[in-house]
Amino acid sequence: MLVDTGLGLISELQAKLGWAVLLQIVPITIVAYNLLWFIYASFFSSLRKIPGPFLARISRVWEMKKTATGNIHEIMMDLHRRHGAIVRIGPRRYDFDTMEALKIIYRIGNALPKADYYKPFGLPSFPNLFDEQNPARHSAIKKQVASLYTMTALLSYEEGVDGQTAILKEQLQRFCDQKQVIDLPRFLQYYAFDVIGVITVGKSMGMMESNSDTNGACSALDGMWHYASMMAYIPNMHAWWLRLSSLLPIEVPIKGLTEYVERRIIQYRLKAAEFGDDAALKGENNFLAKLLLMEKKGTVTPVETQQAVGLNIGAGSDTTANALSTILYYLYTNPRTLHTLREELERYVKDGPISFQQSQSMPYLQAVIKEALRLHPGVGTQLTRVVPKGGLVIEGQFFPEGTEVGVNGWALYHNKAIFGNDASIFRPERWLEANENINIGGSFAFGAGSRSCIGKNISILEMSKAIPQIVRNFDIEINHGDMTWKNECWWFVKPEYKAMIKPRRCCLSRDESLV
């Protein structure tokens, strides 16, 4: 509707003024608007004293330009180190790094709506669980699929996760035998895709066994995150771009993954039709089968089924892969921590898969996971919300209705006022001696409040399965060769490094193992 209205307005102006005049008026209008806004923001706004980059006062170009570097998470941490708890990052956009701000902005009751920033993460006509801005509509969508994410449902997927974790171990052993240097974060993404494939559509994507990006899923997601991260700063252009891409031979990044999801849905529909009843679906334990049964009851539509399946595969794979890559990096570059974790694992389970329930009773394993996610939270940008009618007071400053506010996880988790002077150090023990603030902040790696990641327990299930199997069986030489640890942020902050898998040195003394 917005696209059609915009096109109609342009056509009307062009007919009255002609293209030559129109092309002169548009840039003049843009410059005049930004100049007037700068004057207001600098001299009259109640928020004029909040520090931040000069260009951020008048335009989102500053934030867009910094995002394009792939390093926005580091830039945000530096801004807070220099300016304190509140920084300006755009016209009417402010970022925070405190627990007080987190509790207010991501409150559960009377939740703040998401900003237009999220529009490019979905389709304009069919908002999904992630990009839906209205809290009430989001709640309705969430209610439709909540039963798929309960603890009972989670435990029912455990056997499928065990099967893929066994393949992970086999493939790592093959790399070990071949003394092969691998892109470990990429291979862990293959694992995450294969697991989420089994859980979501009842079938592995076969990435680990082929050691390849089947269906182009990994590259498709990379392209989508790049696109959405930049388009988020001009969100109203998203619908225009989708319309243009449908008219021109423009490659849509997510096409391969979308086609894979569509094929699996068609296969399941045909399977159900062949049997003529629900027996074929009831015998399957995965998201898609359950969604198709919900379709038959009228609780979800075919479009909602496709959205839920696509979102589960897309968001679930990157979240888990990045977390696993980070955990292993910090474990294998901190021998003392690795040794302590191995001692705990040996006390609980001598061999075979570790159950999810067993993993939850291992305090040091859970502390390792939390600490890695603290130092390297998955999302590197602000989780933006809009101040509601009546305004809000945050950190002693009043913010009027319509202001965009949010907390950057990287800035929060590296804040020494919260996590101490060793905030930049990997020290899992902090979670075993944690205070209330740290415990509350600990969950922010998966968002907070009513909009926290609905699939976070699936990700934790995968981590709790994969990490013990790897740690008990292998040593890993990180940064083998000349490729060092890098992090690039396009919404998600993706770790990049090479590694060599080696047999675990089981017979070393404690002192030798700490070298």
From Swiss-Prot:
Enzyme Commission (EC) number: 1.14.-.-
Pfam assignment, any one: p450
Molecular-function GO term, any one: monooxygenase activity
Keyword Ribonucleoprotein: no
CDD domains per UniProt: CYP57A1-like
Binding-site residues for heme, renumbered to this chain: 453
Sorted UniProt keywords: Heme, Iron, Metal-binding, Monooxygenase, Oxidoreductase
UniProt cross-references to SUPFAM superfamilies, sorted A to Z: Cytochrome P450
Transcription among keywords: no
Parts forming coiled coils: none
Domain of life: Eukaryota
Names of required cofactors: heme
PANTHER family assigned: CYTOCHROME P450, P450, PUTATIVE (EUROFUNG)-RELATED
Purpose: Can detoxify the phytoalexin pisatin from garden pea. Pisatin is an antimicrobial compound produced by pea in response to infection by plant pathogens.
Protein family per UniProt: Belongs to the cytochrome P450 family.
Name of the protein in question: Pisatin demethylase
Species of origin: Fusarium vanettenii
Gene designation: PDAT9
